[in-house]
């Protein structure tokens, strides 16, 4: 067990002390003053945090009582009256004007993909930071974005026919983003630069760009550049020229690759994609964050028998046509996602020996970890405007947003940072925030840099809020219901109404099928078409492919065509997606039980046994799906809802758990660290299996349907078991 040390009137896990005091010493701040100030924040804001959680419980009780008395779809007027009476719906501010200052252009004015990655995994995090730039050729060749059958099938040997198809797609892109005055980039035999810009050599003569402003720079000699930099819709694309490369030697123009500016922002996550349950885990996350901020983070990687050190990429430097120099960031602008307001952590105990709120600790420690980038020798390497970007998840309504803003202000005072250095990204993923979004933005109108929708957590809260109204539809059908469209449309509309343009991102949710890139290219274009300036992707490769959508669609232009949502959208938002007569046939129910149980088991076993917070978990059909605590929340809440209404029984759940434990074990057979879920009759199930079952059968009792309270306790139990083995 991690030892604790006394600091002020706090008891602090030794790894947290070590992290904090090293950071304080380097920044020249007084250690005793810091701990005294941290204690003041914890003891003054902790009770307020608890009051906000108590209000959640009280509102939920009133809504539960209403649904018990009025089962089924509620009467619109009576339901609205209840929500207003109890303070669930608050008055809508007449006018909200976002005034956030010192925001980097990647957030304020550019559009492009966004990665989310667990901060406890340094290798993943470095890869995500470096996903600012990605090879289009690699992304196309290595995925199903290009047909993988017949003569295009990838194999052990390099497939030049497949490569030719990749090159053709690349030329299509160049013609789209940098059209010529005449002809096509397919006709190019070479590229050169002069004082007037880019020259495209062809057999029919030299050509110019139809829009000369599309040329941004080059590297190498002007008459034989090694790279040509283009810009389109605010995103850059680099034509890599190497006539000795495997592709370049076969390309008449010597084009070896096209490198796209891809994930312009990345969220390093301390929340849903990590398993951080104690002082050791929390300190690892804080150290990794500081490693990005001071430039020291690195990771040794072994690949194909070769070991090398992976570090964040350097900036990219180009020459311009007029002889000047252009420097572009080599890395994504980094957000850090703190946890929400719910959980306490044993990493720090207050003066009464009680665990402190984890979100308060995160605000203090992650801002401390940002000091080298905000004021030290590494200043400006993440934010060139002097800001720190924090995504704050799972907030319920404007009061909780205001509390987060106050907490950030206190952390700034503690560290002597300029007011409003710490910016806030508001996750619009809880129903009370969605219903009061304008007021929520108003509560942080001078800090907000991001609002974002997410189907999974939002649906998890939808189910839990209306748990007693009746049985919900299966997961796949919930997404198609009117409340979801209202949710997505209102997020963009209200964000624009509040003036987020030029100050903040409007974001959309995750593509959860990392192996299905063809489908992603077909479907995820809907996000920029909605007017959203960013959307989540599960991998650097997906980021590069999703970047294509922002060349096809300019979200900023889309916004000019949008019609504001009205009161009817709020009405639609408040209609729970309950199942109708005939929706829940025995076949549908059986399949949905197994689908959700499979998802829960496959995710929880890695979370509990190995501390892995995000996984590509094979579903019942062996399709790999990205799973994190948000997917766990919706799966467990749906089954809890069906149990509550007698659609299913505990016996059915137990039967599915026992059968699918065997399947999940088989799917993980290649993992040497895996511990089996299946157990013989009469034997005691393991902790992971127990966790999966409890999340379902106790789901109705979990606060807002969250999975963290059960997971954290059982993960600590597993860590203790492993330590004593």
Question: Where in the sequence are the language-model features?
Answer:
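Generic, well-ordered alpha-helical scaffold segments in large soluble proteins
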Residues: 15, 19, 23, 37, ...
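N-terminal-proximal low-complexity accessory segments that begin disordered
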Residues: 1-70, 77-90
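Catalytic or ion-translocation cores adjacent to nucleophile or general acid/base/metal-coordination motifs
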Residues: 2-10, 16, 359, 382, ...
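Flexible, glycine/charged-enriched surface loops at secondary-structure junctions
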Residues: 73, 273-281, 375-384, 417-421, ...
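Acidic, glycine-enriched catalytic cores built around paired aspartates
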Residues: 82-84, 88-142, 146-155, 159, ...
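Hydrophobic alpha-helical scaffolding
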Residues: 6, 10, 49, 53, ...
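Catalytic alpha/beta active-site cores
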Residues: 2-3, 78-81, 85-403, 410-417, ...
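Generic recognition of stable, solvent-exposed alpha-helical segments in well-folded globular domains
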Residues: 11, 15, 19, 33, ...
